[in-house]
Amino acid sequence: MNHKNKSHMKTLVVSVVIAMTSVFNAFSNGNLTQFAYNTTTDGEKVESQTVYTVKNGKYLQQHLKYNYTYDDKGNVSQKEVLKWNEITKVFEKQYCLNITYNAQETSIEYTAWDNKTGAYSDSRAKAVYQTTNAGQGFNYLSYEWNKKENNWNLAKEHAILYGDNALMADK
């Protein structure tokens, strides 16, 4: 895979992580329009980010917290999302995005926090991004966890090719 295709792949993965986080946050909360952020870093790596809602243009109210873990190559391997509980005044675990990489594929698994087990054990969805055709395209595969069968079921598949042969296909 050449440098340009790696760059496209990284951009695509980062975009999807941001989009997935936005979608999950939108479903878990109403129409919040203003946010403030406090980011904690270790060198160039983000360790955590606290998201505040801005009330009346001047008051900050804790909302979400993101914790990041990195693999030995410096790639984000886990993004943990915690939501502020107004009653207990603590951040509570909500879900985790586990990210794995190899030469031709990046996988992002969405796992919800399970209060009964005290762990991220409720797998719900997985997205897989594959480089295809010698770097001339990508496959996007979306899976949903089937609890009865205890395996992943393919929900959507999209193929994206670059150049004159551009094609997008839905399963």
Which residues are covered by each model-predicted region?
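Bacterial Sec-dependent N-terminal signal peptides
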Residues: 1-33
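Buried hydrophobic residues that stabilize the cores of well-folded domains
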Residues: 27-171
